[in-house]
């Protein structure tokens, strides 16, 4: 109501708003970032309690393709808007504060390098959503559930193999000349975007 606007508070319409449609949490983070609003105490309690309770039929060990749209394609659409038009760092800070990262993957809840990594992706012209997801244990599965474009899914899938290769005995010495590294990367057939995401992961 008018008083909530005056208090710069975001309020859900009813007590089951989040369980009915979890995309409302992402939308709330967008409005909070853009307008400088905060969740009301009741709304915050609803978000944290609902995500902790996980009332939805789909669970993490289920096939990504079986997730309902509100935990999949519609969630991605809200995230696409978040990264395209909102102060994304503020919006993601809100989601972290609300303990809502588990809507994507619980590992994202404690991601201290998030803003630095996504800022690097922005500078390199990479899509920001997969740059956020790269630290998940299986980022390609999260991307598949969200319906991220297939080429971006391939980058994330290849990133897991690139990580393994970098830990193997077959990689050049860390102090090798750039042309040695370039030749090694090209020989392995890594896509340029995959290598760029790996660069974003470096401290």
PLM feature segments, named:
Residues 1-146:
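Glycine- and charge-enriched loop/helix tracts that form the active or gating conduit
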């Amino acid at each position: 109501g008018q008083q909530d606007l005056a208090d710069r508070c975001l309020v859900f319409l009813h007590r089951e708003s989040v369980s009915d449609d979890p995309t409302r949490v992402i939308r709330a983070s967008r409005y909070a970032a853009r307008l400088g609003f905060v969740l009301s105490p009741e709304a915050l309690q609803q978000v944290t309690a609902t995500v902790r309770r996980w009332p939805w039929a789909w669970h993490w060990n289920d096939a990504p393709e079986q997730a309902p749209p509100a935990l999949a394609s519609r969630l991605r659409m809200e995230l696409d808007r978040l990264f395209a038009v909102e102060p994304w760092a503020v919006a993601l800070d809100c989601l972290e504060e609300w303990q809502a990262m588990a809507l994507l993957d619980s590992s994202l809840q404690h991601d201290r390098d998030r803003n630095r990594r996504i800022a690097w992706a922005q500078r390199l012209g990479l899509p920001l959503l997969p740059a956020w997801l790269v630290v998940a244990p299986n980022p390609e599965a999260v991307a598949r559930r969200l319906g991220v474009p297939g080429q971006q899914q391939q980058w994330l899938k290849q990133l897991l193999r690139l990580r393994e290769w970098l830990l193997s005995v077959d990689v050049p010495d860390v102090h090798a000349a750039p042309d040695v590294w370039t030749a090694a990367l090209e020989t392995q057939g890594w896509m340029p975007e995959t290598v760029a995401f790996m660069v974003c992961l470096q401290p």
